């Protein structure tokens, strides 16, 4: 097969994300996992755009995103603290800040507590208590539910534990209106079903690492064929659920739906290719990278569809579509 050469050597995380090779972060910043934060903030913005409270005032927007970034940083540090012994046993992760000794656990814990307190203060004082509480829930679910409880015990760890990454849209909705409406819950559900396909693509690439330390990721326990089938199911579920954004948006939904088509087409193409070649590292790597761009794109479309010009265009498009049947031969015959 054409992809046989791609299956010989499993890729490292650094090969999957080349920026890890180019950018060396200070130890105190490395443990905060800053590369994960932009996507969390993007889904927070998406949650805001799905409410009648959009756009937010600049101070509230800054406080929400700043608080969310600090809460995510605290969660990242606590995750590194919990897994430092595990990281030290794997060649790929043994050079990280905590297992290598470049940062002490005491300093890391102090940083995590400081970030969590700063996040809570910023969100309570600058946004509202619901947004602060949801951010704290996201932090706890990542560290306790996913990292400590589910990750070492079940192949479905990311399916259930994915709730941690799905909470930012709820934070965004709460920040905009003081409550979480149907739009926020829709984006929460979308991120939940997007997460397994995204993460299992990465786990296919790193399954030897997970196997070496006894972490029961799906590719380790069930193999690449079963994993590719599961990815396909969740990929299709993501596509189908994404179209509900047409109705979840207060305005601009039709424009969102039209612009969504190429994103979904590409996602389906990549999950089907992986299904045809489940052992291909290149297929898994491509899907992992595209899945990140896909979720960024969804959130960008949500925000774009709420701009005034986009809303006007959406109304014009709806009028044109409503008038279209009258111009078709035989419709009024």
From Swiss-Prot:
Cross-referenced InterPro entries: Protohaem_IX_farnesylTrfase (IPR006369), UbiA_prenyltransferase (IPR000537), UbiA_prenylTrfase_CS (IPR030470), UbiA_sf (IPR044878)
CDD domains named in the record: PT_UbiA_Cox10 (cd13957)
Catalytic activity: heme b + (2E,6E)-farnesyl diphosphate + H2O = Fe(II)-heme o + diphosphate
Protein's name in the database: Protoheme IX farnesyltransferase
Lineage of source species: Bacteria, Bacillati, Cyanobacteriota, Cyanophyceae, Synechococcales
Functional summary from the UniProt entry: Converts heme B (protoheme IX) to heme O by substitution of the vinyl group on carbon 2 of heme B porphyrin ring with a hydroxyethyl farnesyl side group.
GO cellular component: plasma membrane
Domain of life: Bacteria
One biological process term in Gene Ontology: heme O biosynthetic process
GO molecular function term, any single one: protoheme IX farnesyltransferase activity
Transmembrane segments: 36-56, 61-81, 107-127, 130-150, 158-178, 186-206, 243-263, 284-304
Species of the source: Synechococcus sp. (strain WH7803)
Intracellular or extracellular location(s): Cell inner membrane
């Amino acid at each position: 097969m054409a992809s046989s050469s791609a299956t010989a050597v499993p890729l490292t995380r650094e090969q999957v994300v080349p920026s890890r090779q180019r950018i060396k972060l200070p130890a105190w910043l490395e443990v905060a996992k800053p590369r994960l934060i932009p996507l969390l903030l993007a889904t927070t913005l998406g949650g805001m755009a799905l409410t009648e409270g959009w756009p937010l005032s600049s101070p509230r927007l800054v406080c929400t995103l700043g608080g969310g970034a600090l809460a995510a940083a605290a969660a990242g540090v606590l995750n590194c603290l919990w897994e430092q012994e595990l990281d030290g046993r794997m060649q790929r992760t043994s050079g990280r800040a905590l297992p290598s000794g470049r940062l002490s656990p005491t300093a890391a814990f102090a940083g995590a507590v400081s970030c969590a307190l700063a996040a809570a203060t910023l969100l309570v004082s600058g946004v509202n208590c619901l947004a602060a509480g949801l951010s704290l829930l996201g932090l706890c679910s990542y560290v306790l539910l996913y990292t400590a409880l589910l990750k070492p015990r079940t192949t479905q760890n990311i399916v259930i534990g994915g709730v941690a990454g799905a909470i930012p849209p709820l934070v965004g909705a709460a920040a905009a209106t003081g409550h979480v409406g149907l739009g926020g819950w829709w984006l929460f559900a979308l991120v939940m079903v997007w997460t397994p396909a995204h993460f299992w693509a990465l786990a296919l690439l790193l399954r030897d690492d997970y196997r070496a330390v006894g972490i029961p990721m799906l590719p380790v326990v069930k193999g690449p064929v079963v994993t590719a089938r599961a990815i396909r199911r969740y990929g299709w579920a993501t596509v189908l659920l994404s179209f509900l954004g047409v109705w979840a948006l207060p305005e601009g939904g039709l424009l969102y739906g039209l612009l969504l088509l190429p994103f979904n087409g590409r996602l389906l193409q990549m999950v089907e290719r992986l299904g045809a070649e489940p052992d291909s590292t290149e297929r898994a790597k491509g899907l992992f990278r595209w899945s990140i761009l896909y979720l960024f794109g969804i959130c960008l479309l949500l925000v774009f569809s709420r701009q005034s010009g986009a809303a006007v265009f959406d109304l014009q498009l709806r009028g044109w579509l409503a008038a279209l049947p009258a111009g078709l031969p035989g419709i009024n015959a």
